[in-house]
């Protein structure tokens, strides 16, 4: 299954999920980007980074993201949102909640879901949102995550067991080839 990024979303959002004539390629939805990576300090955090000033980046404006999500919902397309930081994950959950309007069967996903607060973690199950988490990121981030988050927030990262215990569907396949 494939997802179109925002630049190629128009066709998916006008026609809905599609399969090519050979049946080999399926486009099920769109992929958006809420924030950047933790290593570069681009992940959107609720509190400043522990090792530098700043809260990270918000890459998709709210009005644009919500409009695309509502169109996706209307045509039955899935949405995958890249969100790494706790602020990025919270905003994504807020937008999903608004766009889905109570539909818990849409199978929308948050790609990475690396840093999630105790308050937001159960919202994944409540909203039917899949946490698509890549184990290789925990290994790759091992050397800088403690410095970026500080010891007080480190427990909010890489929460596979917490997600499973909360009844969240976790997908552990690799979303891309950024971490080898």
List each language-model region with its residue ranges.
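Metal-coordinating catalytic core of metallo-dependent amide/deamination hydrolases
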Residues: 1-86, 90, 123-130, 135-136
């Amino acid at each position: 299954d494939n997802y179109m990024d925002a630049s190629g979303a128009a066709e998916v959002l006008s026609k809905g999920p599609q399969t090519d004539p050979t049946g080999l390629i399926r486009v099920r939805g769109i992929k958006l980007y809420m924030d950047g990576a933790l290593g570069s300090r681009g992940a959107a955090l609720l509190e400043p980074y522990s090792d530098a000033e700043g809260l990270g980046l918000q890459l998709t404006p709210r009005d644009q993201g919500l409009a695309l999500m509502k169109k996706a919902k209307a045509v039955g397309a899935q949405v995958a949102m890249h969100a790494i930081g706790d602020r990025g994950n919270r905003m994504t959950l807020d937008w999903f909640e608004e766009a889905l309007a109570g539909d818990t069967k849409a199978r929308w996903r948050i790609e990475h879901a690396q840093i999630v607060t105790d308050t937001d973690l159960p919202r994944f199950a409540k909203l039917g949102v899949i946490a698509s988490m890549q184990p290789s990121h925990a290994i790759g981030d091992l050397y800088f995550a403690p410095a970026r988050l500080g010891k007080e927030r480190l427990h909010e990262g890489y929460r596979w067991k917490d997600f499973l215990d909360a009844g969240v569907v976790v997908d552990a396949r690799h979303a891309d080839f950024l971490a080898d």
